[in-house]
């Protein structure tokens, strides 16, 4: 099953809105077939593994990271392929999290005399598809907040300078986070100060660009901003308030961007909880927030954050006039802090990344 999980990871960034799935076929103690789901609309992992195994699939054992589908979508049911191949036993890491189909594939295989066991490497399988699991249950994206700061919690100097806080290896990993995400979100201040492209750049990999999402209540973005001019196959969404200039909206949409008018509160802040429903309806299953201190603070306040990836560089900025990770007023009592769970720590040269979960 561990081999199947590693295979599944090869589909990262390409399978959405489908999950990442890997499959391995074993006969007489030898692997005869391996496969993974390469992209949405392409053959599922089980089919690829069975095709590779050929005649050796008969009387074999299948290891698969997600319950085989039992319905016709963009591809035929995998259960039918498993049955026709003559596979005698199936090990499934996790059931399909979709409440409308959960358990159906397993029960169908059992009804045909195939032995099915579940739960092997369950936690690893759930972690692999954490975004897919949340989306099929809530129709809202799985939200990860990423930031890079000094040891004293500053993400930029008083002048706005932030290039570069972290090392090259840390920044490369961030691009892998972008590749794995359906959408990336920043605020208009980041666009104005940094003029980013918000694309994915990974050496040796044709990475997927996430949908670029910019919070811009008053539609202040320039039509000449790099994010609107750079060549990319991904969409751009500008999230504005409800009373923006229609002339400016038309000007921005001429660049190919889509302006989405959203609810605001206090006359200037996008309602992020409401926005998650809008993004879910647009098919965004996973969202990476790379915004500045105001956007990050708003995301935590709105309760939309599922996961954090905080990078710390061995630098101390000194003073309190820089830009902190979170802006605005914080809690008054330590007991009211947001707790982070299931912590993992990774090293990138001298940088440290803390990964953890909010919910």
Language-model segments: which ranges?
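Enzymes that bind and transform nitrogen-containing heteroaromatic metabolites
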Residues: 1, 7-11, 16-18, 34, ...
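Structured loop/turn residues at beta-strand edges in well-structured enzyme cores
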Residues: 55-58, 85, 138, 179, ...
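Proteins enriched for Cys/Gly/acidic motifs involved in redox and nucleic-acid/cofactor modification
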Residues: 13-15, 106, 120-148
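Zn2+-dependent cytidine deaminase-like catalytic core
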Residues: 25-124, 211, 237, 244, ...
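A broad detector of the eukaryotic-type serine/threonine protein kinase catalytic domain
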Residues: 9, 87, 92-95, 114, ...
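Short N-terminal amphipathic alpha-helix/helix-capping patch enriched in small hydrophobics
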Residues: 17-21, 45-46
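Short beta-strand scaffold segments in enzyme catalytic cores
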Residues: 20-29, 147-148, 354
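Generic structural signal for helix capping and beta-alpha/helix-loop junctions
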Residues: 99-100, 126, 269, 296
């Amino acid at each position: 099953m561990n081999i199947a999980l590693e295979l599944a990871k090869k589909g990262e960034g390409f399978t959405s809105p489908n999950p990442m799935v890997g499959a391995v076929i074993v006969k007489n103690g030898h692997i005869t077939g391996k496969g993974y789901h390469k992209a949405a609309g392409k053959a599922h992992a089980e089919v690829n593994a069975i095709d590779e195994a050929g005649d050796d699939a008969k009387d074999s054992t299948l290891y698969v990271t997600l319950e085989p589908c039992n319905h016709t979508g963009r591809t035929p049911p995998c259960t039918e392929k498993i049955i026709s191949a003559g596979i005698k036993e199936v090990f499934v890491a996790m059931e399909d999290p979709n409440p409308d189909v959960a358990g159906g594939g397993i029960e169908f295989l059992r009804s045909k005399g195939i032995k099915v066991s579940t739960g092997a490497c369950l936690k690893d399988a759930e972690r692999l598809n954490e975004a897919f699991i949340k989306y099929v249950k809530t129709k809202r994206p799985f939200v990860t907040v990423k930031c890079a700061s000094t040891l004293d919690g500053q993400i930029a100097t008083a002048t706005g300078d932030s290039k570069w806080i972290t090392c090259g290896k840390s920044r490369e990993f961030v691009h892998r986070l972008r590749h794995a995400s359906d959408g990336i979100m920043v605020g208009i201040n980041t666009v104005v100060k940094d003029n980013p492209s918000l694309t994915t750049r990974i050496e040796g990999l044709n990475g997927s660009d996430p949908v670029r999402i910019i919070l811009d209540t008053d539609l202040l973005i320039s039509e000449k901003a790099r994010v609107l001019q750079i060549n990319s196959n991904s969409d751009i969404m500008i999230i504005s308030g409800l009373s923006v200039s229609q002339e400016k909206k038309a000007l921005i949409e001429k660049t190919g961007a889509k302006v989405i008018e959203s609810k605001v509160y206090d006359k200037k802040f996008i309602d992020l909880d409401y926005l998650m429903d809008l993004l879910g309806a647009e098919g965004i299953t996973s969202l990476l927030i790379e915004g500045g201190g105001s956007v990050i603070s708003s995301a935590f306040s709105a309760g939309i954050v599922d996961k954090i990836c905080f990078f710390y560089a061995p630098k101390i900025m000194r003073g309190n006039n820089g830009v902190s990770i979170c802006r605005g007023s914080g809690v008054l009592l330590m007991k009211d802090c947001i707790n982070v769970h299931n912590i993992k720590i990774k090293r990138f040269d001298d940088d440290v990344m803390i990964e953890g979960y909010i919910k």
